[in-house]
């Protein structure tokens, strides 16, 4: 993700409720699990997607802690 894309993503996250943030986090965690499984099986082609999903989860957690 480029810097502008990251800023837009975080801006979008800040507009969501806690429930929506939790839902988005769970979806990304499921995707991360699937990506790790593919990587272990040697089927993952976009290895950078692992890092990107981890960072998105961290951004969601950051926004969640800002609200608290």
From Swiss-Prot:
Molecular function terms, GO-annotated: structural constituent of ribosome
Gene Ontology CC: one annotated term: cytosolic large ribosomal subunit
CDD domains for the chain: Ribosomal_L29_HIP
Example of a GO biological process term: translation
Keywords: Ribonucleoprotein, Ribosomal protein
Pfam families to which the protein is assigned, alphabetical: Ribosomal_L29
Gene3D superfamilies recorded: 1.10.287.310
Family to which the UniProt record says this protein belongs: Belongs to the universal ribosomal protein uL29 family.
Protein name, UniProt field: Large ribosomal subunit protein uL29
Origin species: Streptococcus gordonii (strain Challis / ATCC 35105 / BCRC 15272 / CH1 / DL1 / V288)
């Amino acid at each position: 993700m480029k810097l502008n894309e990251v800023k837009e993503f975080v801006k979008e996250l800040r507009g969501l409720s806690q429930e929506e943030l939790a839902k988005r986090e769970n979806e990304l965690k499921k995707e991360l699990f699937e990506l790790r499984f593919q990587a272990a099986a040697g089927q993952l082609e976009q290895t950078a997607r692992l890092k990107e999903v981890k960072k998105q989860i961290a951004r969601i957690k950051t926004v969640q802690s800002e609200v608290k």
